Amino acid sequence: MIRAIVTDIEGTTSDIRFVHNVLFPYARERLAGFVTAQQFVEPVKTILDNLREEIAQPAAGAEELIATLFAFMDEDRKSTALKALQGIIWRDGYVHGDFTGHLYPDVLPALEKWKSQGIDLYVYSSGSVAAQKLLFGYSDEGDITHLFNGYFDTLVGAKREAQSYRNIAEQLGQPPAAILFLSDIHQELDAAEEAGFRTLQLVRGDRDPASHHPQVQRFDDIHPEQIPA
């Protein structure tokens, strides 16, 4: 029996184009000015210190760090420091109504149904926990954060490494076979499966011929009660 569902965001609950065409450009446009203005103010000061440690350059100044952050964005590097800074910038955008977090229309009814069935719901995304809470707190459907029991980001590990999912299962206090992981990326599902999770792949477009995981197009095609644990 599935007792917990862990869902990805990009391409799963939300259109990846929202992240790449709205969120990323919004943060990129404001990053340099934000870091320059906030570099000595918490929490940005600590985030930049962590970035210096990440790149092994303890004496790096603001200009150098900004150049590094732009390079990370160009590479789509899953840097915890970059994700934290983006999250702070995005918060202003959400709060000021510059955008709302995209949700596919089939997502909320399914989440509410699973919650009513006693299934615990979690999020696991490469975006920071703060950014995840913003997307669901200021979503197209309003604030739906009350539906989730918890959130995980890269602090628990990389999404293509099986140990990350073992860490999640340990934190949830559930046997891996009682946890269903939803993602649009088969390599992430491979890692979750290696850790003992049940898996389902969301394919919002064409099917993924390289994947051996069960594939569905919508959240209302998912029936946790029919998945053996």
UniProtKB/Swiss-Prot annotation:
Highest taxon of the lineage: Bacteria
Question: What class does this enzyme belong to in the EC scheme?
Answer: hydrolase
Q: Where is the composition biased (Basic and acidic residues)?
A: 218-229
Biological process terms in GO annotation: L-methionine salvage from methylthioadenosine
- Copy out the cofactor comment: Binds 1 Mg(2+) ion per subunit.
Which one of the record's GO molecular function terms can you name?
Answer: acireductone synthase activity
InterPro entries per record: Enolase-ppase_E1, HAD-like_sf, HAD-SF_hydro_IA, HAD_sf
Q: What is its EC number?
A: 3.1.3.77
The reactions it catalyses are: 5-methylsulfanyl-2,3-dioxopentyl phosphate + H2O = 1,2-dihydroxy-5-(methylsulfanyl)pent-1-en-3-one + phosphate
Pathway it works in: Amino-acid biosynthesis; L-methionine biosynthesis via salvage pathway; L-methionine from S-methyl-5-thio-alpha-D-ribose 1-phosphate: step 3/6; Amino-acid biosynthesis; L-methionine biosynthesis via salvage pathway; L-methionine from S-methyl-5-thio-alpha-D-ribose 1-phosphate: step 4/6
Keywords per UniProt: Amino-acid biosynthesis, Hydrolase, Magnesium, Metal-binding, Methionine biosynthesis
Cofactor(s) demanded: Mg(2+)
Q: Which residues lie within the region annotated Disordered?
A: 206-229
Membership in a protein family: Belongs to the HAD-like hydrolase superfamily. MasA/MtnC family.
Q: What does this protein do?
A: Bifunctional enzyme that catalyzes the enolization of 2,3-diketo-5-methylthiopentyl-1-phosphate (DK-MTP-1-P) into the intermediate 2-hydroxy-3-keto-5-methylthiopentenyl-1-phosphate (HK-MTPenyl-1-P), which is then dephosphorylated to form the acireductone 1,2-dihydroxy-3-keto-5-methylthiopentene (DHK-MTPene).
Quaternary structure and partners: Monomer.
**Name of protein:** Enolase-phosphatase E1
Species name = Klebsiella oxytoca
